[in-house]
Structure formats: structure tokens, C-alpha cells
């Protein structure tokens, strides 16, 4: 998530924990289907920017577009022709579209899923040769332009490549797109350079805000899509670097690895594979990681909630509670570092794609936490839904008791500010809910999969009803938890409640 300055305010103690110089801080991951216990492909991302930044969850319905109509991004002036017909897709937008839509992630009606983006930036030498284009393609437009326009993940990558070639990129980004044939991982490196690969089924990856691609076989056209001048630009910038005699993309395009990317790369890999040989002091982390372990959906959720469990590090936002003062940036400070689960997480999503789920249903399930999942649940959504629960659609930029995001944000604030009395009670309950839903989801998906063959409309109505009912019940429970925390929170010396 790239830097967007929005003045939002909820007065809480957690404000003292938020980090200055926010810029960007998303963390993405992929777990190939050969490494999962049930053969599903898992991938997703935490969307990070700042505390108290409302996100919605909606479905944008299919529509016909007038000839010549364009997508226009008010945040940077980017424009691109709309297709004659826009496909239906789900989205997780911001509530301030005049500052960028940021649809972020979702399924479209053809079973293409997308997470966009993990923000990145090339080194200064590269940017002098191929600078970013101010009104080029940015994260704020990515999902909104691609998901309603493509029928396969490869088509999505090809469309991004076409746009970056013709109009340029406004920023560096990592994008992931998937369908029934697998997942593509794409790095938009500089103003007009990009490389995308078909991600291997037998590897996993954790990628915060830096480039990770090493050597790529540009001649493998089936599994690689790349701009023509990737090596040429690096050579012209005099940042061209080889490893074992082969061009290494990340080492050629990256700036030096910063502390926040180091801590999240290291802890993410260790969260999935504690036996991994990576160390906190490594100069870089390769994209494609190998292991003899297999993983579950719960492991992916655990990854996105990671706060250095089992490691000799503590989260930076813990410093204030420990009486060590407020961190002024994401730089590591004497045993404290920037975790994947941090106060800037605004939502987290995990796509669980399975071969036996029809493309009409998205080919899988998106598990979504609006608000940080630190003390909130992931709810399952199939790709054929046409509606979302009303609490997901509240657009307030300050606390609103009818909003899913603001309710979860308040719960997270309260638990983070008062860890001793509240402990892990909330997250333990959330994990219990998730365990129940995971156990139920295969049966639900099977029923709707059988129905979609004979009656797609009835299948959509059933998916809508199940997801709306679950969301309504869950939101009522979240409101009850919020009220209980407010009632039980410690009081200051004057007897006043503290948020």
C-alpha cells in the first residue's frame, strides 16, 4: 500500500503506538499447492498503511460501458479505456475515492482472483534511467482496471504489461493473479520494466516491500512474461548484478534491504518453516523457498498474525507498553523490529483455491478480515456472491458504531492498549469461530458447486444468503465483545475510563 495522507482520527492509546514515516508496509505470501495439506493453492496479503483507515468490502456488478468511456484515477490522473463490458468482481476499496479507489483484492466472475499490491521501489540508479511515470498505472487503479477486463490470470498479467509498456508505471509494485491454472507473481520494477513468472507448485514465498525475483529464464515464454529491456536498463544504470554467472533481478533493481523488510521476510519464512536456514542478518531473501513441510489455511492465518512468536525479537509497537518510548520509524531498535501484524494493517485476505471448486465460484474461497486480524476473524466468501453485509459498506472516516472496520479497529485498540486484563481472550474466540467455519466450508462449497451447474442464479442466491447470515451474526458478536471491553477496561487514577 503506497503512501496516502488521509486525516483520520479515533482517540485511543494505540495512537501512541503507531509509527511515523508510514509510507508502505504490505506483506504478501504464496504457498504452492504441492505444499498444502489439502492440495489447495494459498496466497494473500495484509494491506498496511496506517491505523484508523476505513476499508469497505463490496461487489461491483457487471455493466456495459459507453463507447470511449475511460477509467480515471483522481489520485494521479491515470486514464485507460474501459472495456465494452465490465465483468462482475468483488473489491476491498478505500472510502475516499477522490484520493484513489484502491480496490485491492477480489474474484471476478470468471474465477480470476487478484491481490494488488505490495508496494516497492527501485534503487536511485535505476530510477534515473527509467523513472516512474507520475500519471502511470498505480496500485490505486490496478484491481479496478484488471479484474473487470480479463478471463484468465495470464490475460491479467499481459494487460498490466501492456499498460506499463504503453503508459508507464507510477510506482514499483508486486501483483499476484490466479485462476484454475495456477498463480502468477509479477514485479513492476521501474517506469516501463516488469517481470512475471508462473509460480511453482512446490515452493512458497513471503514478500514485503522489496523485489525478490532472482534469475529468470526469459526464453521460457510459457511461464514468463517480461519487458524487453530489463537487463539493458540495469546495465545502463550500472546496477547490473549477477549471481552464479546469471543476471539477478532483485540485486540489480533493489535499494539496500531495510529493517522493516528484513524483519518481515525473516519472520514470515520462519513462521511457516521454523527449520529454514535463513537468518535475520541475511543480505537478501530469495523469492522461491523450499521445504519438506506442508501447510494449512490456519498456518496462513498464523503468518498474517505473526508478531515474532518464537523469535528473539519484539514488535516495535510494544516499546511504549514496555516503557521504552515511541519508535520514530520502522527501523529496528535494540531487540524490537517491525512485524507482519502491526498497527497499520487495515485488512487481510487469503485466497484458498481448490481444483474441485468451479471457476463460476471463483475456483476457491477468499478468507477476509476487514480490520486487522490480530483480534478479528477471517470470514469465507465464494467468488459468485453479488452482495455484502451492510456493516462492510459504511463509509465514515471516523468511528462509526455501524461499521465493521471501525468496530474491529476499536476492539484491536482496546486489547493492544490493555494486554494484561484482556490477554488473548478475544483472539482465542475468533480462532474458535474460524475453526468452525473451516470445518463447514467444504460442505457449503460442495452444495453450491453442485447447484451452479443447473441453476447459477440459485447458487448465487444461496452463497449470498449464507455469507450475509454469517456476517450478521458475527458482527453482532463483535459489537458485544466491543461493549464488554469498554465496560471492563481499566480506569485511570481519577476513575475515568481510558480507551
Curated annotation (Swiss-Prot):
One Pfam family linked to the record: Peptidase_C69
Reactions listed under catalytic activity: an L-aminoacyl-L-amino acid + H2O = 2 an L-alpha-amino acid
Entry annotation: catalytic residues: 26
Record's keyword terms, sorted: Dipeptidase, Hydrolase, Protease
GO biological process, one term: proteolysis
Enzyme class, UniProt record, top EC level: hydrolase
GO molecular function, one term: cysteine-type exopeptidase activity
Family membership noted in the UniProt record: Belongs to the peptidase C69 family.
Name this protein carries in UniProt: Probable dipeptidase B
Amino acid at each position: 500500500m503506497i503512501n496516502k495522507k488521509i486525516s483520520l482520527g479515533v482517540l485511543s492509546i494505540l495512537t501512541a503506538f503507531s509509527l511515523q514515516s508510514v509510507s508502505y508496509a504490505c506483506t504478501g505470501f504464496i504457498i504452492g499447492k504441492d505444499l498444502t495439506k489439502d492440495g489447495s493453492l494459498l496466497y494473500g496479503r495484509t494491506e498496511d498503511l496506517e491505523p484508523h483507515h476505513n476499508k469497505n468490502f463490496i461487489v461491483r456488478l457487471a455493466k456495459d460501458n459507453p463507447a470511449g468511456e475511460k477509467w480515471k484515477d483522481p489520485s494521479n490522473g491515470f486514464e485507460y479505456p474501459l472495456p465494452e463490458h465490465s465483468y462482475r468482481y468483488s473489491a476491498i476499496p478505500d472510502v475516499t475515492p477522490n484520493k484513489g479507489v484502491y480496490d485491492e483484492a477480489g474474484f471476478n466472475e470468471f474465477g480470476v482472483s487478484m491481490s494488488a499490491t505490495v508496494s516497492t521501489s527501485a534503487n536511485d540508479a535505476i530510477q534515473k534511467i527509467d523513472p516512474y511515470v507520475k500519471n502511470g498505472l498505480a496500485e490505486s487503479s490496478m484491481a479496478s482496471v484488471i479484474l473487470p477486463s480479463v478471463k484468465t490470470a495470464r490475460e491479467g498479467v499481459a494487460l498490466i504489461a501492456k499498460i506499463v509498456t504503453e503508459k508507464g508505471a507510477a510506482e514499483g509494485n508486486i501483483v499476484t493473479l490466479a485462476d484454475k491454472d495456477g498463480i502468477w507473481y509479477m514485479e513492476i520494477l521501474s517506469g516501463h520494466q516488469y517481470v512475471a513468472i508462473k509460480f511453482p507448485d512446490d515452493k512458497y514465498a513471503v514478500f514485503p516491500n522489496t523485489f525478490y525475483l532472482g534469475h529468470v529464464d526469459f526464453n521460457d515464454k510459457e511461464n514468463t512474461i517480461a519487458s524487453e529491456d530489463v537487463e539493458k536498463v540495469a546495465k545502463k544504470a550500472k546496477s547490473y548484478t549477477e549471481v552464479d554467472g546469471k543476471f539477478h533481478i532483485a540485486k540489480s533493481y533493489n535499494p539496500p534491504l531495510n529493517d522493516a523488510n528484513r524483519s518481515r521476510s525473516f519472520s514470515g519464512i520462519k513462521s511457516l518453516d521454523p527449520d529454514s536456514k535463513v537468518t535475520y542478518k541475511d543480505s537478501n531473501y530469495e523469492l522461491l523457498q523450499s521445504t519438506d513441510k506442508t501447510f494449512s489455511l490456519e498456518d496462513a492465518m498464523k503468518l498474517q498474525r505473526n508478531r515474532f512468536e518464537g523469535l528473539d525479537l519484539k514488535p516495535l509497537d510494544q516499546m511504549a507498553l514496555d516503557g521504552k518510548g515511541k519508535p520514530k520509524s520502522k527501523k529496528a531498535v535494540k531487540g524490537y523490529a517491525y512485524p507482519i501484524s502491526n498497527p497499520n494493517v487495515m485488512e487481510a485476505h487469503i485466497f484458498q483455491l481448490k481444483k474441485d471448486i468451479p471457476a463460476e465460484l471463483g475456483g476457491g474461497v477468499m478468507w477476509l478480515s476487514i480490520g486487522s486480524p490480530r483480534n478479528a476473524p477471517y470470514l469465507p466468501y465464494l467468488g459468485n456472491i453479488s452482495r455484502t453485509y451492510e456493516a462492510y459498506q459504511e463509509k465514515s472516516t471516523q468511528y462509526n458504531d455501524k461499521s465493521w472496520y471501525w468496530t474491529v479497529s476499536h476492539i484491536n485498540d482496546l486489547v493492544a492498549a490493555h494486554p494484561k486484563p484482556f490477554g488473548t481472550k478475544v483472539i482465542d474466540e475468533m480462532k474458535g469461530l474460524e475453526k468452525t467455519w473451516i470445518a463447514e466450508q467444504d460442505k457449503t462449497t460442495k452444495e453450491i458447486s453442485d447447484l451452479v451447474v443447473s441453476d447459477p442464479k440459485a447458487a448465487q442466491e444461496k452463497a449470498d444468503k449464507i455469507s450475509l447470515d454469517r456476517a450478521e451474526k458475527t458482527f453482532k458478536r463483535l459489537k458485544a465483545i466491543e461493549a464488554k471491553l469498554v465496560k471492563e477496561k481499566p480506569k485511570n487514577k481519577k476513575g475515568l475510563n481510558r480507551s
